[in-house]
Curated annotation (Swiss-Prot):
The keyword Transferase does not apply. Pfam families: RRM_1 (PF00076), zf-CCCH (PF00642). The modification N-acetylalanine is found at residue 2. A zinc finger (C3H1-type) spans 12-40, 149-176. Identified in the spliceosome C complex. Heterodimer with U2AF2. Interacts (via RS domain) with PHF5A (via N-terminus). Interacts with ZRANB2. Interacts with SDE2. Interacts with SF3B1. This is Splicing factor U2AF 35 kDa subunit. Residues 65-147 form the RRM domain. Its main location: nucleus.
Length: 237
């Protein structure tokens, strides 16, 4: 009996535990669900709930009419958001294996961001810290998520352009980033991690030369100025 219960745990045959929450980390019934939502005590994945605001869904003029947002503007806005959050997660908490943003419209999925870290310890640290932070003028609600395999959580029909449920589908409709940004964030990341220790040594030597009156620290200061300008332009944390 125990083996059978273990085999059906989190599936549609399980009458006790919610299969949607187990697969997707969210359920449209919320706390009213008749089945249990077993929140994980440890996980590689965290969920930032309702943090992404899609301009195409929210932009309205003062008279209540919708403002047109072009596809190009939409992609630029989304890429900026994705890069900002991804970079913040890696710089403050640890290596990110995967990050996904829901483009659904249902209240339980709209704007959810799922960040899968390489280490569970980094995910735990991120949740504790992020729940004391704000983003874009709103408090962040972060929690550990049971989702580790996004292939199970995604709507396959949506990926093939055939989902008939639209934005209110209960499976994830993941919003893609541009190819250029994907290459930048994921393609170069491994090289960056391999060279990180060497970069620290070079920066240390540059600072030492700068204090000694040489000009070796100029490149580092210029990078800091560029980062500062970038944060002023798009920083919402």
């Amino acid at each position: 009996m125990a083996e059978y219960l273990a085999s059906i745990f989190g599936t549609e045959k399980d009458k006790v535990n919610c299969s949607f929450y187990f697969k997707i980390g969210a359920c449209r019934h919320g706390d009213r669900c008749s089945r249990l939502h077993n929140k994980p005590t440890f996980s590689q994945t965290i969920a930032l709930l309702n943090i992404y605001r899609n301009p195409q869904n929210s932009s309205q003029s003062a008279d209540g009419l919708r403002c047109a947002v072009s596809d190009v503007e939409m992609q630029e806005h989304y890429d900026e958001f994705f890069e900002e959050v991804f970079t913040e997660m890696e710089e403050k908490y640890g290596e990110v294996e995967e990050m996904n943003v829901c483009d659904n419209l249902g209240d339980h999925l709209v704007g959810n961001v799922y960040v899968k870290f390489r280490r569970e310890e980094d995910a735990e640290k991120a949740v504790i810290d992020l729940n004391n932070r704000w983003f874009n003028g709103q408090p962040i609600h972060a929690e550990l998520s049971p989702v580790t395999d996004f292939r199970e959580a995604c709507c396959r029909q949506y990926e093939m352009g055939e989902c008939t449920r639209g934005g209110f589908c209960n499976f994830m409709h993941l919003k893609p980033i541009s190819r250029e940004l994907r290459r930048e964030l994921y393609g170069r990341r491994r090289k960056k991690h391999r060279s990180r220790s060497r970069s620290r040594e070079r920066r240390s030597r540059s600072r030492d030369r700068g204090r000694g009156g040489g000009g070796g620290g100029g490149g580092g200061r210029e990078r800091d100025r560029r980062r500062s300008r970038d944060r002023e332009r798009s920083g919402r944390f």
